Amino acid sequence: MEQKLYLVHLGYYDPELSGGVYESHVNLFFIGTDFEDVRDKAKADLLVQKHKMHIDGIQLIEKVNGHKIIVDKKDGDETQIQNHNFRELSKK
């Protein structure tokens, strides 16, 4: 089956932030074949389990600004992400 890119919006209550009264959120990317597959992968994720996160929503990302997203499996299981903070971007 074809693998696709999904964004999973997760909520959790962190006792270190305001005593856990307010819900915090994080978005994580997963690769999967369908929504159920991605749901299961998200629930099995160690970070999700550690913080007792729950799934608020899942988005399938197929096209962005006219560009089709193609998932191409490479060797290894690592995730590679490049991050740039506001200060780095505002210098340009």
State where each predicted segment sits.
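Extended intrinsically disordered, low-complexity coil regions enriched in Ser, Thr, Gly, Ala
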Residues: 18-57
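Generic structural motif
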Residues: 13-15, 33-35, 63
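Short, mixed-charge low-complexity intrinsically disordered segments
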Residues: 48-92
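Short aromatic-glycine-(Arg/Gly/Cys) micro-motifs in beta-strand/loop hairpins
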Residues: 1-25
